[in-house]
Amino acid sequence: MITLTGHTLTIEEMKRLLLEGEGVTACPNSMQKVAECREVVEKIVEDGKVVYGITTGFGKFSDVLIQKDDVKALQHNLIQSHACGIGDPFPEEVSRGMLILRANTMLKGVSGVRPLVVNMLLEFVNRKIHPVVPQQGSLGASGDLAPLSHLALVLLGEGEVFYKGKRVHAMVALTEEGLEPIELEAKEGLALINGTQAMTAQGVLSYIEAEATAYQAEFIASMTIEGLQGIIDAFDENVHKARGYKEQVEVASRIRDILHDSKLTTKQGELRVQDAYSLRCIPQVHGASWQVLNYVKEKLEIEMNAATDNPLIFDGGEKVISGGNFHGQPIAFAMDFLKVGMAELANISERRIERLVNPQLNDLPPFLSPEPGLQSGAMIMQYAAASLVSENKTLAHPASVDSIPSSANQEDHVSMGTIASRHAHQIIQNVRRVLSIEMICAMQAAEYRGIENMSTVTKSFYHQGRQQVPSITNDRIFSTDIENIAYWLKTNYSIKERLDVNAAL
């Protein structure tokens, strides 16, 4: 059980919450702050003060005063009218993440909701009732209004949820779990939907997958180095310390550890003086992608614990301030950066695939075919990889450079951060498939070189891979092989043992 405080949530905890289904509870001190802040909102309503989002309309209607008797209707109307999401739903892990992050930001005690609202969000998390949230429709400022409105709907007993493996009406799940839908009161609708939790939840899942994929890329690249009898000198510690990038040094170190007892790597001048860049520059390129990942992780962990709604309440109600923390620009930039960093792992992987299948670049059978000419072998796998990296180049175009004014030009600059997050996740799926193709080719090359000559680590990795797909002894439908390896990499290859390279993988 992970305790939410509003201040301390980490990526490592989100892994447990999203991928392992761990439960959550609220810190009592944080809940006390929530209750105290709520008293301020109720006094504002009682006194009839004019405060944006509490006693006024929203967006361009911020100058419209709402009567005390209409405050509840205002919140309900807000949720229904803003639930304009379209397209396929986010993965369940993302909608679960949205619930967790929304509760966490409310626990900072500056949003003005009742403790009841926070508790309801946590009930949904712990009972694994996950909102069906369409992926499209957010501008990323004022936050993720449309996606979060679909999240808020289910608290009211409206909309749809994923529950026990099925997509059902929210009331079906609430009834089965013995929960009553809530009725929103002053400010609560706005507090639920005005924030960056859709782009951030998708960003967190993307980061978690990207981190695992980046480690896997090192094991796969190491197997390719063996298949091509690569020069190990290029990974010498002195080379990488001379440049000074920590991540580059770490990648080189891990690859040296993976290959330390390999009989397939060569020394400088033994077969050739230098390798091509796609082998020789693995630490430089992969290391640069790790720099991106480290940047993204830092920004996500800030945003996961950020108050992103509007207005915010401070000093016991002395200050109720309309600001712009809902603006998703920091996450938009981070996700666009993640797109580029991950796309580059696929770019260099595809070039290594080419070196594995092109007989002009190696002494292996053409296209790793068991019977060149009669059988095409891995020829079209390289085409597929080329297609995926080309698609990534389109997806990697920065969403954050775009902005379209909305709400009659009141909201005249927006982040498009949710688009960036969604595209980052798609790029990661493509990268994993490119790496899957490289792994299939590298395993085949290893067989030609002699499996007994592989390092202890790559040999273990090879045998696990062969449990997913057989050797290429005849042409077959290779799309199945690619998807099988990709699924295995995504779901069954633990990164927890990534640094213990002598352990069984």
Swiss-Prot record:
PROSITE patterns: PAL_HISTIDASE. It holds the Pfam family Lyase_aromatic. GO terms for biological process: L-histidine catabolic process to glutamate and formamide; L-histidine catabolic process to glutamate and formate. Its main location: cytoplasm. GO terms for molecular function: histidine ammonia-lyase activity. Signal peptide: none annotated. It catalyses: L-histidine = trans-urocanate + NH4(+). GO terms for cellular component: cytoplasm. It comes from the Bacteria. Belongs to the PAL/histidase family. This is Histidine ammonia-lyase. It comes from Bacillus cereus (strain AH187). The lineage of its organism: Bacteria, Bacillati, Bacillota, Bacilli, Bacillales.
